[in-house]
From Swiss-Prot:
It is found in: Cell membrane. Involved in the efflux of purine ribonucleosides, such as guanosine, adenosine and inosine, as well as purine bases guanine, adenine and hypoxanthine, and purine base analogs 2,6-diaminopurine, 6-mercaptopurine and 2-fluoroadenine. Therefore plays a role in maintaining the cellular purine base pools and protecting cells against toxic purine base analogs. Modulates expression of the purR and G-box regulons. The chain crosses the membrane at residues 5-25, 43-63, 72-92, 99-119, 129-149, 158-178, 206-226, 235-255, 262-282, 289-309, 328-348, 354-374. This is Purine efflux pump PbuE. GO terms for cellular component: plasma membrane. CDD domains: MFS_NepI_like. GO terms for biological process: transmembrane transport. One of its GO terms (molecular function) is transmembrane transporter activity. Belongs to the major facilitator superfamily. DHA1 family. PbuE (TC 2.A.1.2.25) subfamily. Its main location: membrane. It comes from Bacillus subtilis (strain 168).
Amino acid sequence: MNFKVFLLAASTIAVGLVELIVGGILPQIANDLDISIVSAGQLISVFALGYAVSGPLLLALTAKIERKRLYLIALFVFFLSNLVAYFSPNFATLMVSRVLAAMSTGLIVVLSLTIAPKIVAPEYRARAIGIIFMGFSSAIALGVPLGILISDSFGWRILFLGIGLLALISMLIISIFFERIPAEKMIPFREQLKTIGNLKIASSHLVTMFTLAGHYTLYAYFAPFLEETLHLSSFWVSICYFLFGISAVCGGPFGGALSDRLGSFKSILLVTGSFAIIMFLLPLSTSSMIFFLPVMVIWGLLSWSLAPAQQSYLIEIAPDSSDIQQSFNTSALQVGIALGSAIGGVVLDQTGTVVSTAWCGGSIVIIAVLFAFISLTRPVQTAKKSSL
């Protein structure tokens, strides 16, 4: 495996932190800015929507820019966004910082995902993608629990300053170890958008969207879930986040290896089906930590196991527009996060109990399984692809 893949993954740790760390510190942000937990949860939704909209659009607008230079520019904007978050005097300013962070993150992740599979042998393609997503999941394992502990001692703002410093380190690493990466000739953006009209491709993106929507219906409010069901202190909540994160870190490589071994077809069905089952088991296991922890670990493993298979699948069925399809898929992932966070907030507000978010989340993942069957059973329209 090319060591540069791991360097790209290291860069995604910083950008993963800024998105994922907020879920663990919602109570602190809400208290400091005098807003409700549900309102604070919008920080997750706004980031996800900003990422989803800007990712494909910025990729198209910057198609002619040399990729290393673009990567460094995106990292610098990301650094500035974290400074804005650190100094934000109110909720509105913090929201602005989230939009800036989302736009730069969208470019950084898509560039990482498009570069990584091109610098490894074809048989390692899914694993390379899995390693990139391992950077995101590492942010859960290390950042979220440490973020909870650090914010309890020094406040939540210091976290964004630290993430900004990580972005500067990433800029240094990329500038030293990567040579110029010429921009490749791309199909016009308007033509690439037309591929979404292909039911096989569109359904694949919907699998990602509904899987993440189901996941984040609960995960966006995981800290309150642990406090309500298991009556855990902040320390033990951070421990659970850490254990979840460790399993999620393993999810990316596991999903990549599974896809390379079984093929993307079987992997997608296996992961989505298992994910739906585990979502329904989560609230049933909260009678004891002995029952809950194994279920939670499996949940964490599966949460990042789908992405490598999905990205590899899209490269297989749409090779002529694979770059933009990977961007669309990460956008679908972010739309799912935003949708799930919003649905979780509504469910929590209407029912008054965070436990109901797990039941709702599991039901949403079932929709993802149905779309997986639709996509996987449709033939590849080679003629249509070649016309692009």
